[in-house]
A protein has these predicted regions:
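Flexible, low-complexity segments enriched for small/polar residues
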Residues: 1-12, 18-231
Length: 231
């Protein structure tokens, strides 16, 4: 990959854009051997969580004060996980990028792992509120973007395809489905009926609470598993 990309770089008068376009469209970039092999940095974990779930921030132009305050809230979380953007520990950057033999494993220790989980727990439950504006994961809204939310099997598969870089076993997915979406039942219709009931009458608070509670539990559980720490 190095030599062909270098050739593209020279051919395009040292414009980096064609190089990146070629790399991001290459088979090598999507090689399964490159997936799930690194622990996410705090920035990777936090920003990917916000983007994958489509968390909405206040407008940075019309509501810049609230927007900047919420960005700073996120920055504080990153700093607590030992990666404060723009403030590396020294000129070498963060040790996880160069310190052998641990490298990326440095990101997780007895202090940072609980904080990584606390962040996702916070975002899927109460979020963060300032001046009446909130950043929080909309569990129902995210689920509505999936291909077939009424089918608990498809729902879990679609969610995992977005959130995970490594596959879960069939047994693990079945257990998650039965314990969370089916509330310890065994038939899929326990979830299907609940979801369809909400879709038929989205203004009904009881129907919303039923699906929202289960979905929050599902996503919180998935984000607390070790597989979610991998990129």
């Amino acid at each position: 990959m190095i030599e062909p990309l270098a050739s593209i770089f020279r051919t395009n008068n040292y414009d980096i854009k064609p190089v990146l376009a070629t790399l991001f469209k290459s088979e090598h970039f999507y090689d399964v051997l490159n997936q799930g092999c690194l622990i996410k940095s705090p920035v990777d974990k936090v920003i990917s969580c916000l983007r994958e779930f489509g968390v909405v921030f206040p407008d940075s132009v019309s509501q810049y004060s609230d927007a900047y305050a919420m960005w700073n809230y996120i920055r504080n979380w990153l700093a607590s996980m030992n990666q404060d953007p723009g403030d590396p520990p020294d000129v070498s950057g963060w040790p996880a990028y160069y310190q052998a033999p641990q490298f990326h494993e440095i990101w997780i220790n007895s202090d940072t792992l609980p904080k990584r989980n606390q962040f996702t727990d916070t975002m899927i439950t109460n979020g963060y509120t300032r001046n009446g504006k909130k950043i929080v994961i909309n569990a129902v809204g995210f689920t509505q973007t999936l291909s077939n939310p009424a089918d608990p099997n498809a729902l879990i598969d679609d969610a995992l395809a977005i959130l995970y870089r490594v596959p879960l076993s069939v047994t693990a997915k079945q257990t998650i489905k039965e314990q969370i979406l089916l509330t310890n039942q065994t038939q899929d219709y326990y979830w299907t009926n609940a979801w369809n009931g909400y879709i038929a009458n989205p203004s009904d608070q009881a129907s919303f609470n039923t699906v929202n509670t289960r979905l929050k539990s599902l996503y919180q559980y998935l984000m607390n598993l070790s597989e979610y720490q991998l990129s």
